Amino acid sequence: MVKVVVSGALGRMGTNIGRIVDEAPDMELVGGIDVREGTLFKTEVVPAAKIDAFLNEKKPDVLIDFTVAGAAVENIKAAARNGVALIVGTTGFSPEQRETIAAAVEGNVPAVISSNFSVGVNIFWKLVREAARELGDYDVEVTEAHHRYKKDAPSGTAKTILEILDQELGSREKAYGRVGETERKDEIGVHVIRGGDIVGDHSVLFAGNFECIEVSHRAYDRAVFAQGAVRAARWVVGREPRIYGMQDVLGL
């Protein structure tokens, strides 16, 4: 039985994850962390200020974190102090925050950290990598769309796309939304859309002189991210104490 605490328990993702864990026969939802007190499927949710005492009391196997960057760093450090494995789906970390996370995790606890836990998105990333290897002389444009409340832009998933393209194509200049007179350079265009309740759309256009190839992924429900995070939570227990990605979970 895998015991789970959800951080960001009262948010959209936290509620989805809590539901899946609560219904899973091989898992136990033992509580949640958020900015305020509450309940998550009849389990206690405490403020983040009480996280150390809460983890010590509940003794979970895994903490699943979907919060914001600043809060997530503190949650990760607390989990590492208490020997709790981590699933981190929070995005928007600065380079300095990433270094802090690595220092807290490495050698202490296993952690799966990913900008997107959807199985489909991880396959999408693999396809983008393969396309970039074969189409290095094509122009490349990245577009992402999310709901009006998403705080970071570009999305973490889009940033991962750009990292993959940089690895395969070299570090091209990024053109973030074009306006006025433009001239095509050795660059990658990046376009961000925010509106409505869009769960998450990502596409990469490879444009050649005589053809275009577009690789895209569209999420219809946040449950797809929650399901992937819970799958990772099952996988991470008992692993060596270091940072993993969702592609490790999937064996890609």
UniProtKB/Swiss-Prot annotation:
Gene Ontology MF term list: 4-hydroxy-tetrahydrodipicolinate reductase; NAD binding; NADP binding; oxidoreductase activity, acting on CH or CH2 groups, NAD or NADP as acceptor
Residues that hold (S)-2,3,4,5-tetrahydrodipicolinate according to the record: H147, G156, T157
Entries under PROSITE patterns matching the protein: DAPB (PS01298)
Primary location recorded for the protein, binned into one broad class: cytoplasm
Active site: H146 (proton donor/acceptor), K150 (proton donor)
Pathway(s) this gene product operates in, as recorded in its UniProt entry: Amino-acid biosynthesis; L-lysine biosynthesis via DAP pathway; (S)-tetrahydrodipicolinate from L-aspartate: step 4/4
Name the UniProt record assigns to this protein: 4-hydroxy-tetrahydrodipicolinate reductase
Gene from which the chain derives: dapB
